[in-house]
Amino acid sequence: MEFKIMSTTDKIEQKVIEMVAEKLNKDKAIITTDSRFIEDLKADSLDTVELMMAIEVEYGIDIPDDEATKIKTVSDVIKYIKERQS
C-alpha cells in the first residue's frame, strides 16, 4: 500500500482550487494553477473580491486591495498565502 504525503503547497493548492470552484460555481476538474480568474474562469470583479475575502478568512491573512489587484491566477493566490505563512 502506498501513501502520498501531501506537502503544504499541495494542501494549499487543493484547498484554493476547492474554494475557487465553490465561489465561481465551476467544476474543480477545469481549474488548474494556471487558471486566470477573469479570462479563463469568467469571474467578475465582485467574484474576485468575494474570493479574496474567503481566502483571508480561511488562512487568517490580510490581502490589501493593492495586492489583491495583482492576484490574477490560482498560482498567484497560492504564492501569496505561502509568503504570508512563512
Swiss-Prot record:
Pathway: Lipid metabolism; fatty acid biosynthesis
NCBIfam families: acyl_carrier, PRK00982.1-2, PRK00982.1-4
Function according to Swiss-Prot or TrEMBL: Carrier of the growing fatty acid chain in fatty acid biosynthesis.
Classification lineage: Bacteria, Pseudomonadati, Pseudomonadota, Alphaproteobacteria, Rickettsiales
PTM note: 4'-phosphopantetheine is transferred from CoA to a specific serine of apo-ACP by AcpS. This modification is essential for activity because fatty acids are bound in thioester linkage to the sulfhydryl of the prosthetic group.
Protein's UniProt name: Acyl carrier protein
GO molecular function ontology, one term from the record: acyl binding
Organism: Rickettsia prowazekii (strain Madrid E)
A GO CC annotation given for this chain: cytosol
Residues of the Carrier domain: 10-85
Biological process, per Gene Ontology: lipid A biosynthetic process
PANTHER family listed in its UniProt record: ACYL CARRIER PROTEIN, CARRIER DOMAIN-CONTAINING PROTEIN
Localization: Cytoplasm
